[in-house]
Amino acid sequence: MTTVQEAVPNLIPTQDATPRPAPKKVEAGVKLRGADKVARIPVKIIPTDELPKKPDWIRVRIPVSPEVDRIKQLLRKHKLHSVCEEASCPNLGECFSGGTATFMIMGDICTRRCPFCDVGHGRPKPLDVDEPKNLAVAIADLRLKYVVITSVDRDDLRDGGAQHFADCIREIRALSPGVQLETLVPDYRGRMDVALEITAQEPPDVFNHNLETVPRLYKAARPGSDYDWSLDLLQKFKQMVPHVPTKSGLMLGLGETDEEVIEVMHRMREHDIDMLTLGQYLQPSRSHLPVQRFVHPDTFAWFAEEGYKMGFKNVASGPLVRSSYHADQQAHEAKIKL
């Protein structure tokens, strides 16, 4: 079990007070990634010499399938983005080969610059007013039964993008009335009340927002975000729409301790969160936050056991688990009637 004393020193190499070049000017529509992206956060990330070698339980075989190409072509046809591609998800091959995808709306440029994430940062373009209809058509073409919709952060919008989520849900249900929808939303920083009022009018079947990491690591891992704000967002939605299950997740391997993970899980239950995902953080590039540890599958299994003891309806906990990975199975196993 990892202690705080063991975890804290490991974070020191990621911070440096030495001068650094001025970050590149951000132009509208230009996507910054890697070193250009993390250069704009308060805590300097020192590039690692090389990416860490993954243990055997982390390695993924990339299946070769025409279905992968078909879905990619369909996304391009409808001018859509998948978080599977943008965030370099290790499960992309499996999900695409199975004919499913998690759709990322509101563009592929995020106004945040979290150094664990591989999605590009910058000044996004205006919303595509045709995206809700295009998304609905694509989902109908794929004949999907369970769909996850997520987004980049859009701090440039007065409602944080909540109305665009609602428009997408409305269009999808019009063309595919039997589809079940899970939304993985941003934190709506400074816009919680207006965003939740809109969301409550057109709620999804599962409302998901990730805490991502333990509060001690927020400054380094989630600059611009607030741990308690995210918990409140999930609880307030549950109070407004009590019949819709809520869900959240954590990445492990950023320097947290097992005790801190358990404490966050308790806080989640105190805020009426129903479903939990726990997965291993994988460093997207040398310029991102380094992996501090690879959590053993047995430890993930232990977290799942503890989660069920706390009252979570479902816990998906494993090295390759991601928030939207097998989300349909998770909802089904939780026996949630959608």
Swiss-Prot record:
GO terms for molecular function: 4 iron, 4 sulfur cluster binding; lipoate synthase activity; metal ion binding. Its EC number is 2.8.1.8. It holds the Pfam family Radical_SAM. The gene is lipA. The keyword Glycoprotein does not apply. It comes from Pseudomonas putida (strain W619). It catalyses: [[Fe-S] cluster scaffold protein carrying a second [4Fe-4S](2+) cluster] + N(6)-octanoyl-L-lysyl-[protein] + 2 oxidized [2Fe-2S]-[ferredoxin] + 2 S-adenosyl-L-methionine + 4 H(+) = [[Fe-S] cluster scaffold protein] + N(6)-[(R)-dihydrolipoyl]-L-lysyl-[protein] + 4 Fe(3+) + 2 hydrogen sulfide + 2 5'-deoxyadenosine + 2 L-methionine + 2 reduced [2Fe-2S]-[ferredoxin]. InterPro entries: Aldolase_TIM (IPR013785), Elp3/MiaA/NifB-like_rSAM (IPR006638), LIAS_N (IPR031691), Lipoyl_synth (IPR003698), rSAM (IPR007197). Its cofactor is [4Fe-4S] cluster. Binds 2 [4Fe-4S] clusters per subunit. One cluster is coordinated with 3 cysteines and an exchangeable S-adenosyl-L-methionine. It is found in: Cytoplasm. Gene3D superfamilies: Aldolase class I (3.20.20.70). Pathway: Protein modification; protein lipoylation via endogenous pathway; protein N(6)-(lipoyl)lysine from octanoyl-[acyl-carrier-protein]: step 2/2. It is an enzyme of class 2 (transferase). This is Lipoyl synthase. Belongs to the radical SAM superfamily. Lipoyl synthase family. Residues 96-313 form the Radical SAM core domain. Keywords: 4Fe-4S, Cytoplasm, Iron, Iron-sulfur, Metal-binding, S-adenosyl-L-methionine, Transferase. The keyword Iron-sulfur applies. [4Fe-4S] cluster 2 binds at C110, C114, C117. One of its GO terms (cellular component) is cytoplasm. Residues 1-24 are annotated as: Disordered.
